[in-house]
Amino acid sequence: MKTACLKYFVSCSIFSAVLAGSYAQAAPVISELFYDASGSDAGLVFLELFGSPGESLDGLVVEGINGGTGDVYSSLALSGVMPGDGVFVIGDDSGGGTSVANADLVADIDYQNGPDSVVLRGLSGVLDAVGYGVFGVNDIFAGEGGAAPDPSAGSSIARLNALFDTGDNSVDFSVLDTPTPGSVPSVSAVPLPASAWLLGSGLMTLVSLRRNR
């Protein structure tokens, strides 16, 4: 009886830990990136972050990493707090402002086409990163896991679920034909990730079998 209870406790603890680790956001994440407009990029490129409303952005730095050399070619220090909707948009400055809707900050962030990476750093180190494009054997990948897709001009890459981070860009990001700066999927409308659902189903089956013995 003690063994069955212990296994039940461990199984539920693992399931809870997986869900907590998947959904709890201790820091902002990169939720959308648009780097290649149809025609000139000036004033159209943007980076979108998602985090907890009111969370401080002081000390955060966004870097553009060259995929060919690994050098930091763009660095932007952030400040202030995350807006009430939890979405912070950085719009590229064309020299005369920006054309990015819902921009919370306007700065020179004309990110290069891939293969490259964008890294979000905090005082403790890297908080999030996305590498995009097709990386060759000699290229430098500064993202997480595998590279996110490299969309055609006019499209962006966006996190499928702003509350879920597997640590693999190829899984977490997809192409958006129409960029949506300032808008992320509603948390209530996003289904539980398949991996978490399968794990939960398996654990509940295990518990059921233990109870029937």
Where do the model's predicted regions map?
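C-terminal outer-membrane/trafficking sorting elements
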Residues: 211-213
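A short, hydrophobic C-terminal helix/tail in secreted or cell-surface proteins
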Residues: 191-209
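Sec/Tat signal peptide C-region and signal peptidase I cleavage site
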Residues: 21-26
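Bacterial N-terminal signal peptides
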Residues: 11-20
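A recurrent domain-boundary module in secreted/ectodomain proteins
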Residues: 166-189
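Activation on beta-sandwich/Ig-like modules and their edge loops
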Residues: 27-153, 160-161, 167
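Bacterial N-terminal signal peptides that target proteins for export
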Residues: 2-11
